Amino acid sequence: MRNFKREYRLIAGLTGTMGFEVGAVDATTGRSLRIVFNVERGDSESNNTASINIYNLSPQSLAVLAQDNCVIDLQAGYDGDMATIIQGIVSHIETNRDGADTCTEIDIVDGLVATRDTNVSVSYKGSINGKKIISDAAANMGCSILFSPSCTFPAFKNFSFVGSATKLFHQVCGASNTNYSIQNGVIQVCAANEAITAMAYVLSAETGLIGFPERLYDNASSSNSGNANTTKRKTQKGWKVSFLMNGHIQANDYVALESSLASGTFRVSKIDTKGDSEGTGEDSWTCTAELLEVS
């Protein structure tokens, strides 16, 4: 992987329509529009989010962003190697002056319309597998759905449900010892502590690892029956790592970590991506991830 020459593309518009794209270098100025972004993604049921500041957008581009349910696809990386960091719906937009420039602040939410607007009313007679229930719910949400290799679901008898699709997912996945999240508009359902695929991305100094991994701990409680006081003990659960921008690594992926402090295969539980196309220093175009031990 060559971590050279930062590149990004921001593509915006309503689904199925022509919108706009920025990020390519202007042939006259030799520069692209400046972008600053912070993307937070994880394996929880909460929607992934991003805040994006982009400078000197045209009035036509601003009009596209102002449309209801405008979709943004943010791609970033290096010369010849970009990947989607996040795809989501604009939830807030505001443009202000910043000296001689204009700065447009954009908030986006992954899967906003699907989770906000979809209610389901279902009733299945007899025995129905949980996978069928949530697959039908995903179709109602307009989302594709993926399952990790070891996902299994129990059968539900005479299952009925009325309410939000997200509550249905929570109920069925909770009863199946699986977890769901939305990643770039796709629902991912994973068995406990399992990645969505078996493929692992190598993360080492040669592929962009910055510095050394930092231990992550869970606080676990232990108590003595003869004493009401509760003590805390630290149990290691994984590693926190920083690395140069790599949009190929997403939440629910496996990472093969290669470092003198830690090595092995881990699952990405959370990943924060920060970028400034005109920033200086390697820390202005990076990812920070929490990698959990795979049991």
PLM feature segments, named:
Residues 97, 101-113, 140-220:
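Short beta-strand-centered interaction patches in the first periplasmic/extracellular domains
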Residues 118-127, 155-159:
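Second-shell loop/turn segments in exported
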Residues 1-106, 238, 295:
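Assembly/oligomerization scaffold segments
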Residues 37-61, 65, 193-295:
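An acidic/polar, Gly/Ser/Thr-rich interaction patch typically located in mid-to-C-terminal regions
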Residues 87, 131-135, 166-170, 236-238, ...:
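Extracytoplasmic/secreted envelope proteins and their assembly/folding machinery
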Residues 130-144:
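Glycine-rich, acidic and aromatic/proline-enriched surface loops and short helix-turn segments
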Residues 101-117, 280-295:
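Short solvent-exposed strand/turn elements
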